[in-house]
């Protein structure tokens, strides 16, 4: 059955640009876009329902392509410590940081993790997010990584959203492997990843390449295992120092490399050549009060596609609004509103390998879109906070909050 959505203007975000269609209409059939264009060119047809969008601006549904939305506890006390001058690295070295979340996550049941995550993700959904990536990485052993990945799959069943799962077992060194990082990486590669993949719980594999996490050589071992399992890879790279992680990611044709504050021009060129998306995470940059900016001009100059994401996590980016990240991306990183919106639509889709089906409004793509009561799409980036009036459509069906 075909449904007509009419009386609107559309920012399709094709090719990373607004690509406006004014005085437009959309026809959906099932979960797909059947037709899109000028309302005066609408083909004669019979529709099961006609929806008047009252002159709204329609954008693709937002895609949050880098989150750690499933976790136990929170780290508000560490937030206070950082404001007293304690660094992220110092907190991690004293057993805080990721380690404290690992303890809380291991202690939590699947049901507890699911219920707490749903509260957070519903906030994102009400902000216009229709697709979300969620990483494991707070279990750090087979049993608890599996628990997290099972919860991620359940979120996809519970909510009207597209949910992609990423195994981030190589996030930090668990306490039982203290001073045995090579042995832990071997355990990930020979035991955890093959089993978790065999259970159908993994869509992609990620790792944290940093002095306080894993070396490029160790990450490469994980990447080779992922490659052998036909799983795409992603990487946390160059957040706190320059280790060449983004070039390593490019070598393995990673979907994305994320953070990237300390990447070099050679890293940028490598990512441009491989088509790897640069995912910028302004929430973590802001909360950690960083001063080293990602090389935005170089990324743009070399044609690297830039995505933005919330990096929702309990330690460095407890961000429940992707729209706020849009404003931060523009204010902190000097992205234009158009570039920022591309970063949570088509470029974010590319960072998840979903660009053929998601991220822009085109015939044949999934009917995920948001109708905003605004005068121009730049307003979505411009306004700070609040709940902009909107209608969210997921797979051709309006989501009722």
From Swiss-Prot:
It comes from the Bacteria. Zn(2+) binds at residues 66, 68, 236, 311. It catalyses: 4-imidazolone-5-propanoate + H2O = N-formimidoyl-L-glutamate. Fe(3+) binds at residues 66, 68, 236, 311. Binds 1 zinc or iron ion per subunit. Pathway: Amino-acid degradation; L-histidine degradation into L-glutamate; N-formimidoyl-L-glutamate from L-histidine: step 3/3. It is an enzyme of class 3 (hydrolase). Its cofactor is Zn(2+); Fe(3+). This is Imidazolonepropionase. The gene is hutI.
